Design a protein with these regions (language model features):
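Hydrophobic alpha-helical transmembrane segments
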Residues: 11-56, 61-62, 67, 71, ...
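Single conserved hydrophobic/aromatic residue that forms the stacking wall/gate
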Residues: 1-10
Length: 172
């Protein structure tokens, strides 16, 4: 019973902690005014980059994909698709930097690339877990989409990585 309880605790933290970190991106303290300001753009940008990366990787991989990324884990992902997804995210980061200039273009590009790398890693990690457990989908709440975890697997590693990236960038 304690093994089941600890497994549930780890699972819940694995999913809940990254999404709780979205608050770090959304709320910014203003020391001069002694209050916090809310900005939804940074948390939303993580999801935009994830969606652009997934869509760009899928389309590029379908057109040009020849070299498998990690065939044993996710047989349909290719290096060409992964690079294509990254290129589409860089384009999206230029657009975001134009419409939301509170960060430089370079910081937006760095954020996009951070999300690409860690989002892909999160997707592969979840695919590996499912493969090891012998399950196809992580749930049936979204028929044909593999479950809720499949919709957000990229964000589970991308959000903490984005928080660390933006914190490190703010130090320099």
């Amino acid at each position: 019973l304690s093994l089941v309880g600890s497994e549930m605790c780890i699972r819940d933290r694995y999913i809940a902690l990254p999404f709780a970190l979205l608050n770090v991106l959304a709320f910014h303290s203003d020391e001069t005014a002694s209050l916090s300001q809310y900005n939804a753009i940074l948390p939303l940008s993580i999801f935009i980059f994830n969606w652009v990366n997934d869509t760009g990787a899928y389309c590029t991989g379908m057109l040009f994909g020849k070299h498998k990324l990690f065939e044993r884990i996710s047989p349909k992902k290719s290096w060409e698709g992964s690079i294509g997804g990254g290129i589409f995210c860089i384009i999206a980061s230029f657009l975001l930097s134009h419409f939301f200039p509170f960060m430089s273009t370079g910081v937006w590009i760095g954020l996009a690339l951070t999300v690409v790398v860690f989002g892909t890693w999160g997707d592969l990690t979840e695919s590996l877990l499912k493969r090891r457990l012998g399950i196809k989908d992580s749930g049936n709440i979204l028929p044909g989409h593999g479950g809720m975890l499949d919709r957000f697997d990229s964000a589970i590693l991308a959000i903490p990585a984005a928080v660390v990236y933006l914190y490190v960038v703010s130090l320099f």
